[in-house]
């Protein structure tokens, strides 16, 4: 009893790990037999207790953690703020994803940590709680899912799903959560089965590689070791102890002068504790890596056996044990299909918190600003940073380690427990990371702009791949785009030189919205096909069109510096290239000609433009026939038409007939002297020779007429009929017959499908006959009405101007039309006739002035057509065309006419179909320069895309203007607004042409060269301004609005004030500036929307809505500046590193990747570079032979340690403990081969041969010459196929190939491993009893040692060739163990 009183009593819970420790202590202390008795008693005790407790599990035992509600709420709040920041453009998509995952991961972890204390306090014997750490059933993670929250899931690829499951299994999941949990769960039968088979196959390959590794000797005599040190704190103590226990020291350990451990001593727990206490120098230990043998291992390099705690015995098959101990946990762990969501295996970063309230101070020189991986601004410390926090009575000092983020600013007031810094976690570098591409897609359609310079890699100059050099925003400016459904136009003048590429414009189909008005949502231009629809849809109220201003459909030629656009004005005719697709057939090219009289004055009813429809164009000659209803010329004087240099007078006939007929014929005009090869009234076929150098293009009847000095030869195609009686012929001469039945004689009648023309021909001698000729019918409705091109209210000035569309035939009824060779004949011309109302005001106006105005913006020259009623003086400003200011016209209109819109581009006023009412808005044309192809489209800026913000009285500028108005009341406030767009190249604003100038002067040059006072410049500059209604207002001469091109602000100047004073008026908002949402513009609070400033008003700002996307350096931007993107287009691609999920089911593929040495980024980036650099440096320093040796050695050592760490990391993250030596044995096998390289050919090995590293070293020593080789990592599969035994290889994979190769090479298998002997049914050469078996015969013991000495070199050579140290004796006799070990070692080391 006295003894029992002295015993300690421990009142502690013993879990699985504690029991393991106790057992190992028992074994150390009492030995195996005694321990097993104790454990039996513990087992019985356990069963008794379990029976007495009778634990059962009910649903009431699942108690939810009380703090869950507010933790989840807090996380949701953080996510909401994050979402806002992303919307404002402060954080990009990846930072948002990372941060949201970390928020939820942290929440889930807090809940998990709360779980155990909660159970301990409320119900310590809760069965769920007991199970959670018993180790037998489940673990804390599973219980956490039952009573905490299920948390983040990852999909089958191991990617995180950023929507967490907030419920736990006790509460039940919502439908969405259930689907996510199915998607991320690993409970699928197939999944488990597949993964189990994977793990099994991994085990098989591992065993295959190392099955022949057996402990054959006690000591290989190596002096090398691997040093392990816990001094720098890189290795946690637990792992340090695990690494050391059971190993053998490679060197003596000294403490000062005293030796505390000797070489070849094995390390127990006592020795490890002594090392930790004394903090000795790095400890050098022996590992399987350092063993000098090739195909076996010695006892000291292996260390203690895990089974009994002593040195491993000879004959132990340690290879197979190693393979199984790595593969088996995988097999077991695939069955643990729960998913912990532990993507961030490194955990969240540690935080440094302020100890008390106070002001923080640090040295600014030691930090530099950066962004954290969550997108927050922070300072990065490059070295240890000392931070002081001064509160009222005490000063705290905090040291922040290097590479940490400081989250506060200097002199900032911090509160107690506020996070002031974030320390990167130590395991950060060991994480499995992978580089991932993430594409960001556009949410809305619009136009792309960026706010920084962009790198164009030289090979990508014309492509749309751009790299961002610094963090910046990409903006998508809103606006629906619309392909013009009408033909694209150009107002290039006749004979202008144009870029070739500028004509390659996408052509849209012409649709008819009057039929399907509701369906055509995105066709912008309507085509009016009938005059009825024109009347119905007339716009009576001009205000409907207010916002639809388009600045001219011009092919935008982007003028490069070296190309001048030259114009030769000839006869004042302007050509609009026109091409349409009709019936999916490309018509031939045709132009719209706008003829403007040289004096620029149009009378009433004069033809303003005409268009030759290609449908009415014929290659052949012929006759037109129609029923004349009323034919009169439009303009009384006949116009001079210039036709291929031949001037002809052509009257223009207007016709009101529905159709006309064209009878084709072929006409040849030949000189009188030419010799004909055909006769008159003969019938010929196609391609008949008519004269020596002409052939007929059609077949038919020939008629020859001789005139003065020339012959006219006509070929009529058609059928010939010989009627019987002459009286019937008279009916059929020179008339058109409609489709129907034609009686040729009484007996037979012929059905005619088409119109025919019947002509009577009477030859002189022969019988007369009738020629029936085919007829081409032209319906009037066939052609393209110019109404489609010019909508009804096109050029109206208010309601005055009228356009009438007139078709007329160029040739009279029945007149023969003769074509000049190889040119086509235009039969019908469509004209646009200009007219205007004769109301009281304008009755006196008999003429309209028309002129072009050219506006040059960013080197693009835009032409506008202006039609002006009333008398006005026009003066030309002559400039060179290549001058960027362009050619301008000044109209001296007084201020009384400001309300009349001065600019009407021909194509700028267009009617929008009713269905597009909601899309009314300003139109801007953007130019896409896309791989040498320019394509033009429109953007409709509707009122929904514009946002107007009224700053209230808080704005400084507003007050200034008010004051100035009192002093100088002439300034009307309504004119203090400016549209966006200037003569400047401001970041290539291709799309904003709203500044319409009618006196274009190169402002930049003036301001730069002359430095004129702004007051003078303001007189030179005259702008048309566009107000918020889209109306264009003439410049008001009383207000001096000056656009300062340098700051791009609008300044309001008076004569009274000095320039500097006014500079302060509007410094807040610049035109064209991008404003993010939530930016404070006024004192009264934040703005509501993000966008680009379009118009600055005196008391308000008009923005074009835009969506910002943040992009960090290195991101790839797709698309060009100013390009139009549609919803869902790829905008940016980010490349970022993310840590891979660390659960074992995804860990197994990782282990496999490492062992198969597949190049995954995380390995190859480091190792390949290391190998290359080492090889280069070392050969330079040491010289070639030693260089290869040392380089290969170092590479291999470094790589081996790296591989072991990677594999251990996966298993440790799952709480699986595998001793390093198992992994080392396998890694040693896959890294012990080198590849003989081709430079420096050696006599022994052929290039490309795989040989063992040790064998190569021995060969170099023996031959005393360099063998060039490089290190190779074989994967476990390749290593299994390149062993010394072909039987083992053939039984693994590719049996036929392996056996065939072995036969050809005459390979010998010495049956050294287990597998070969199993295959052949022999005795397995392993096992602890094997040594006794080998020692049976002793007759060879007497081989004298000196014989060996004599024959040293031969033995060495054989050793090299067979590359087995124990090989050459075993072939003579089975018992090579009889040779004394000493002689063996002596021989090898000599």
UniProtKB/Swiss-Prot annotation:
<keyword id="KW-0150">Chloroplast</keyword>
<keyword id="KW-0548">Nucleotidyltransferase</keyword>
<dbReference type="InterPro" id="IPR038120">
    <property type="entry name" value="Rpb1_funnel_sf"/>
</dbReference>
<dbReference type="GO" id="GO:0009507">
    <property type="term" value="C:chloroplast"/>
</dbReference>
<feature type="binding site">
    <location>
        <position position="298"/>
    </location>
    <ligand>
        <name>Zn(2+)</name>
    </ligand>
</feature>
<dbReference type="GO" id="GO:0003899">
    <property type="term" value="F:DNA-directed RNA polymerase activity"/>
</dbReference>
<comment type="function">
    <text>DNA-dependent RNA polymerase catalyzes the transcription of DNA into RNA using the four ribonucleoside triphosphates as substrates.</text>
</comment>
<dbReference type="GO" id="GO:0008270">
    <property type="term" value="F:zinc ion binding"/>
</dbReference>
<keyword id="KW-0934">Plastid</keyword>
<dbReference type="InterPro" id="IPR007081">
    <property type="entry name" value="RNA_pol_Rpb1_5"/>
</dbReference>
<feature type="binding site">
    <location>
        <position position="301"/>
    </location>
    <ligand>
        <name>Zn(2+)</name>
    </ligand>
</feature>
<dbReference type="GO" id="GO:0006351">
    <property type="term" value="P:DNA-templated transcription"/>
</dbReference>
<dbReference type="InterPro" id="IPR042102">
    <property type="entry name" value="RNA_pol_Rpb1_3_sf"/>
</dbReference>
<dbReference type="GO" id="GO:0000428">
    <property type="term" value="C:DNA-directed RNA polymerase complex"/>
</dbReference>
<feature type="binding site">
    <location>
        <position position="291"/>
    </location>
    <ligand>
        <name>Zn(2+)</name>
    </ligand>
</feature>
<dbReference type="Pfam" id="PF05000">
    <property type="entry name" value="RNA_pol_Rpb1_4"/>
</dbReference>
<dbReference type="Pfam" id="PF04998">
    <property type="entry name" value="RNA_pol_Rpb1_5"/>
</dbReference>
<dbReference type="GO" id="GO:0003677">
    <property type="term" value="F:DNA binding"/>
</dbReference>
<keyword id="KW-0862">Zinc</keyword>
<protein>
    <recommendedName>
        <fullName>DNA-directed RNA polymerase subunit beta''</fullName>
        <ecNumber>2.7.7.6</ecNumber>
    </recommendedName>
</protein>
<keyword id="KW-0808">Transferase</keyword>
<keyword id="KW-0479">Metal-binding</keyword>
<keyword id="KW-0804">Transcription</keyword>
<dbReference type="InterPro" id="IPR050254">
    <property type="entry name" value="RNA_pol_beta''_euk"/>
</dbReference>
<feature type="binding site">
    <location>
        <position position="220"/>
    </location>
    <ligand>
        <name>Zn(2+)</name>
    </ligand>
</feature>
<dbReference type="GO" id="GO:0005739">
    <property type="term" value="C:mitochondrion"/>
</dbReference>
<dbReference type="InterPro" id="IPR007083">
    <property type="entry name" value="RNA_pol_Rpb1_4"/>
</dbReference>
<keyword id="KW-0240">DNA-directed RNA polymerase</keyword>
<comment type="subunit">
    <text>In plastids the minimal PEP RNA polymerase catalytic core is composed of four subunits: alpha, beta, beta', and beta''. When a (nuclear-encoded) sigma factor is associated with the core the holoenzyme is formed, which can initiate transcription.</text>
</comment>
<dbReference type="InterPro" id="IPR012756">
    <property type="entry name" value="DNA-dir_RpoC2_beta_pp"/>
</dbReference>
<comment type="similarity">
    <text>Belongs to the RNA polymerase beta' chain family. RpoC2 subfamily.</text>
</comment>
């Amino acid at each position: 009893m006295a003894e029992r009183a002295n015993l300690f009593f421990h009142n502690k819970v013993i879990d699985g790990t504690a029991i393991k420790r106790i057992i190992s202590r028992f074994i150390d202390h009492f030995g195996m037999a005694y321990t097993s008795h104790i454990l039996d008693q513990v087992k019985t005790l356990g069963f008794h207790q379990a029976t007495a407790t009778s634990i059962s599990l009910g649903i009431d035992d699942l108690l939810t953690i009380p703090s869950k509600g507010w933790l989840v709420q807090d996380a949701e709040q953080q996510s909401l703020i994050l979402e806002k920041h992303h919307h404002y453009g402060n954080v990009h998509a990846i930072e948002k994803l990372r941060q949201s995952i970390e928020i939820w991961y942290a929440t889930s972890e807090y809940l998990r940590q709360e779980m155990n204390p909660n159970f301990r306090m409320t119900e310590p014997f809760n069965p769920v709680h007991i199970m959670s750490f018993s180790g037998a059933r489940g673990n804390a993670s599973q219980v956490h899912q039952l009573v905490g929250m299920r948390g983040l899931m990852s999909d089958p690829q191991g990617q995180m799903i950023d929507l967490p499951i907030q419920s736990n299994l006790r509460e039940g999941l919502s439908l969405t959560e259930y689907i996510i949990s199915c998607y991320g769960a690993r409970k699928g039968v197939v999944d488990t089965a597949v993964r189990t088979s994977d793990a099994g196959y991994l085990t098989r390959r591992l065993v295959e590689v190392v099955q022949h590794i057996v402990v054959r000797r006690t000591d290989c005599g190596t002096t090398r070791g691997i040093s392990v040190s816990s001094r720098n704190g890189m290795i946690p103590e637990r792992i340090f102890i695990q690494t050391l226990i059971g190993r053998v020291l490679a060197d003596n350990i000294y403490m000062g002068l005293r030796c505390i451990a000797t070489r070849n001593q094995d390390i127990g727990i006592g020795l490890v504790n002594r090392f930790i206490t004394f903090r000795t120098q790095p400890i050098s230990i022996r590992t399987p890596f350092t063993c000098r043998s090739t195909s076996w291992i010695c006892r000291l390099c292996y260390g203690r056996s895990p089974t009994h705690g002593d040195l491993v015995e000879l004959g132990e098959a340690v290879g197979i044990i190693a393979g199984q101990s790595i593969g088996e946990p995988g097999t077991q762990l695939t069955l643990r299909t729960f998913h912990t969501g532990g993507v961030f295996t490194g955990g969240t970063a540690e935080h440094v918190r302020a100890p008390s309230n106070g002001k923080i101070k640090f040295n600014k020189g030691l930090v530099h600003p950066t962004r954290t991986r969550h997108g927050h601004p922070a300072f990065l410390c490059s070295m240890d940073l000392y931070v002081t926090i001064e509160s009222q009575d005490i000063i705290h000092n905090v040291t922040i380690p290097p590479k940490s983020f400081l989250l506060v600013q200097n002199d900032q007031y911090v509160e107690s427990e506020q996070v002031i810094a974030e320390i990167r976690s130590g395991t950060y570098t060991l994480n499995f990371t992978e580089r991932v591409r993430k594409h960001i897609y556009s949410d809305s359609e619009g136009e792309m702009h960026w706010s920084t310079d962009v790198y164009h890699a030289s090979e990508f100059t014309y492509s749309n791949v751009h790299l961002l050099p610094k963090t910046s925003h990409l903006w998508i400016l809103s606006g629906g785009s619309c392909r013009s459904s009408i033909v694209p136009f150009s107002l290039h003048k006749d004979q202008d030189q144009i870029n070739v590429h500028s004509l390659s414009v996408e052509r849209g189909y012409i649709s008819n919205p009057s039929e399907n008005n509701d369906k055509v949502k995105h066709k912008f231009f309507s085509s009016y096909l009938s005059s009825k629809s024109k009347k119905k849809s007339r716009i009576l109220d001009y205000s409907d069109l207010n916002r639809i201003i388009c600045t001219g459909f011009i092919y935008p030629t982007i003028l490069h510096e070296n190309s001048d656009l030259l114009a030769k004005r000839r006869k004042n005719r302007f050509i609009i290239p026109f091409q349409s697709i009709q019936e999916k057939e490309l018509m031939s090219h045709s132009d719209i000609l706008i003829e403007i009289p040289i004096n620029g004055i149009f009378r009433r009813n004069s033809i303003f433009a005409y268009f030759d429809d290609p449908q009415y164009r014929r290659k052949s000659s012929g006759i037109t026939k129609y029923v004349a209803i009323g034919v009169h010329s439009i303009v009384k004087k006949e116009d001079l038409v210039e036709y291929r240099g031949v001037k002809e007078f052509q009257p223009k006939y207007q016709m009101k007939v529905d159709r006309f007929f064209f009878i084709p014929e072929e006409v040849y005009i030949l000189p009188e002297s030419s010799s004909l090869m055909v006769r008159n009234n003969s019938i010929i076929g196609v391609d008949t020779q008519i004269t020596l150098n002409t052939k007929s293009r059609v077949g038919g009847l020939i008629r020859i007429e001789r005139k003065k000095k020339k012959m006219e030869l006509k070929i009529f195609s058609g059928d010939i009929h010989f009627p019987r009686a002459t009286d019937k012929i008279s009916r059929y001469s020179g008339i058109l017959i409609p489709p129907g039945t034609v009686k040729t004689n009484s007996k037979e009648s012929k059905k005619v499908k088409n119109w025919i023309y019947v002509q009577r021909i009477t030859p002189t001698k022969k019988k007369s006959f009738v020629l029936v000729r085919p007829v081409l019918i032209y319906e009037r409705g066939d052609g393209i009405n110019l109404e489609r091109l010019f909508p009804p209210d096109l050029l109206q000035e208010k309601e005055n101007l009228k356009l009438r569309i007139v078709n007329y035939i160029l040739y009279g009824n029945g007149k023969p039309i003769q074509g000049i060779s190889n040119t086509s004949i235009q039969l019908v011309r469509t004209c646009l006739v200009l007219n205007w109302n004769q109301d009281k005001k304008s009755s006196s106006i008999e003429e309209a002035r028309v002129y072009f105005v050219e506006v040059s913006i960013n080197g693009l020259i835009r032409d506008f057509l202006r039609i002006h009623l009333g008398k006005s003086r026009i003066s030309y400003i002559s400039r060179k065309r290549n001058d960027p200011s362009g050619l301008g016209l000044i109209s001296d209109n007084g201020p009384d006419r400001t309300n009349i819109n001065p600019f009407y581009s021909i194509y700028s006023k267009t009617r929008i179909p009713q269905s597009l009412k909601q899309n009314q808005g300003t139109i801007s044309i953007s130019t896409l320069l896309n791989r040498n192809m320019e394509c033009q489209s429109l953007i409709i800026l509707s009122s929904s895309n514009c946002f107007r913000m009224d700053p209230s009285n808080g704005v400084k500028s507003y007050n200034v203007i008010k004051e100035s108005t009192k002093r100088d009341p002439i300034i009307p406030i309504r004119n203090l607004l400016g549209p966006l767009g200037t003569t400047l190249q401001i970041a290539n604003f291709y799309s904003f042409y709203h500044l319409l100038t009618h006196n274009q002067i190169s402002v930049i040059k003036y301001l730069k060269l002359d430095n004129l006072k702004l007051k003078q410049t303001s007189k030179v500059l005259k702008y048309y301004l566009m107000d918020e209604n889209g109306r264009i207002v003439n410049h008001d001469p009383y207000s001096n609005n000056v656009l300062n091109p340098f700051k791009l602000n609008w300044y309001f100047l008076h004569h009274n004030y000095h320039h500097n004073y006014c500079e302060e008026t509007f410094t807040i908002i610049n035109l064209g500036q991008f404003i993010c949402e939530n930016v404070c513009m006024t004192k009264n609070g934040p703005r509501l929307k993000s966008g680009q400033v379009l118009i600055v008003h005196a008391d308000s700002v008009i923005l074009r809505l835009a969506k910002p996307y943040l992009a960090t350096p290195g991101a790839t931007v797709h698309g060009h500046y100013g390009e139009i993107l549609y919803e869902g287009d790829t905008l940016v691609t980010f490349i970022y590193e993310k840590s891979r999920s660390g659960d074992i089911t995804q860990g197994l593929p990782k282990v496999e990747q490492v062992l198969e040495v597949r190049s995954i980024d995380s390995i190859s980036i480091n190792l390949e570079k290391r190998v290359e650099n080492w090889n280069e440096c070392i050969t330079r320093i040491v010289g070639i032979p030693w260089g290869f040796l040392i380089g290969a050695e170092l590479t291999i050592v470094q790589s081996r340690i790296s591989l072991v760490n990677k594999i251990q990391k996966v298993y440790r993250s799952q709480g699986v403990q595998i001793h390093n030596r198992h992994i080392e044995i396998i890694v040693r096998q896959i890294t012990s081969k080198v590849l003989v390289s081709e430079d420096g050919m050696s006599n022994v090995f052929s290039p490309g041969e795989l040989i063992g590293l040790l064998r190569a070293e021995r060969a170099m020593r023996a031959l005393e010459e360099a063998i060039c080789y490089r290190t190779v990592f074989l994967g476990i599969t390749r290593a299994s196929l390149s062993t010394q035994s072909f039987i083992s290889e053939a039984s693994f994979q590719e049996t036929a190939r392996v056996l065939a190769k072995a036969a050809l090479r005459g390979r010998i298998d010495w049956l050294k491993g287990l597998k070969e002997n199993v295959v052949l049914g022999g005795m397995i050469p392993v096992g602890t009893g094997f040594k006794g078996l080998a020692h049976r015969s002793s007759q060879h013991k007497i081989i004298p040692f000196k014989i060996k000495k004599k024959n040293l070199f031969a033995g060495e050579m054989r050793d090299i060739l067979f590359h087995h140290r124990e090989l050459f004796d075993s072939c003579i006799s089975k018992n090579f163990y009889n040779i004394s070990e000493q002689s063996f070692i002596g021989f090898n080391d000599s």
